[in-house]
């Protein structure tokens, strides 16, 4: 396994996972659930 591939996969996973988390936190702060 190349270190570059691992870092790219990790960054993609972080970006994909951070999307719903940020939306959830914003909705919790606004109380629009």
From Swiss-Prot:
- What's the main place this protein lives? plastid
Give the record's keywords alphabetically: Chloroplast, Membrane, Photosynthesis, Photosystem II, Plastid, Thylakoid, Transmembrane, Transmembrane helix
Gene Ontology annotations of biological process type: photosynthesis
GO cellular component terms, semicolon-separated: chloroplast thylakoid membrane; photosystem II
Q: Subcellular localization, per the record?
A: Plastid, Chloroplast thylakoid membrane
Q: Which Pfam family is an annotated match for this chain, by its short name? A: PSII_Ycf12
Q: List the disulfide bonds.
A: none
Bilayer topology reads:
Single-pass membrane protein
**What role does it play?**
A core subunit of photosystem II (PSII), probably helps stabilize the reaction center.
This protein is called what? Answer: Photosystem II reaction center protein Psb30
């Amino acid at each position: 396994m190349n270190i570059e591939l691992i870092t790219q996969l990790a960054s993609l996973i972080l970006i994909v996972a951070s999307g719903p988390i940020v939306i959830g936190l914003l909705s919790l702060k606004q109380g629009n659930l």
